[in-house]
Every structure is written in C-alpha cells, then in structure tokens.
C-alpha cells in the first residue's frame, strides 16, 4: 500500500523548517516521512515542494531578512527512499544551484554525498 502524498511530504505549500545555522547559512529543511516511492506522482509532488522552497528564497521578504546569506536546501528522509527519488535529486543539483542554493540529502540523519556519475 502506498502512502498518500500528504503523508510523505506534508503540506506541499508549506516550508517545514527554516533556520539559521551557526555557520551563517539559511537552512531550509524539507521533511519526507516514511517510504517515499518513485512513482511519477510522488516525483512531481517532491519537485513542486522543492520549487516552493526555492521560489521563497527569491521573495522580497526572504531577501530583506537574509540578504546575501548562503542557502542550503536539505531534503531529509526518515527512511531510504526509492532509488528513482535519489536519481531525481542527483539531477536536481544544478537546478537548485541556479537559485543560489546548495542541495543536501539526509537519510535517517546520515548525510548522503552524490558521486559524479560518468
């Protein structure tokens, strides 16, 4: 049985966590609960939520509060997602960088580092 999109990602229009790190970065955390499957609907929902986060960094309100701050978009999974989701996020790095943000992935509190696929 697959989980509902809202169970995996919460409200797609809401930023789960926005915090200031000790390193002087804006940390935006997107929390994914349970097993995140690789279906097209799930992939689209994840991209939509990520886009909401990234668009928020361009808002006047955000720019006024955090002018020139480095931004980290951290996608955190409570359990290992489908490989299709990891492949998708690998391909999203340049897109996230276009917004001036860095993409981090965490699975069960363990940071995942992408290696170049060649």
Question: Residue ranges of each PLM-predicted region?
Answer:
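Amphipathic, soluble alpha/beta structural segments
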Residues: 10-13, 21-26, 80-85
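Sterically constrained small-residue positions within well-ordered secondary structures
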Residues: 19-21, 64-66, 96
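Acidic, aromatic-enriched beta-alpha/helix-loop junctions
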Residues: 40-64
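Helix-rich interaction surfaces within compact, conserved domain-sized segments
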Residues: 71-72, 77-118
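Aromatic/basic-lined ligand-recognition segments
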Residues: 2-21, 106-110, 115-118
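Intrinsically disordered, low-complexity boundary segments flanking structured domains
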Residues: 1, 15-17, 60-62, 92
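Short charge-dense sequence patches
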Residues: 1-9, 36-47
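Short glycine-rich, basic-tinged beta-strand/loop micro-motifs
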Residues: 24-36, 66-80
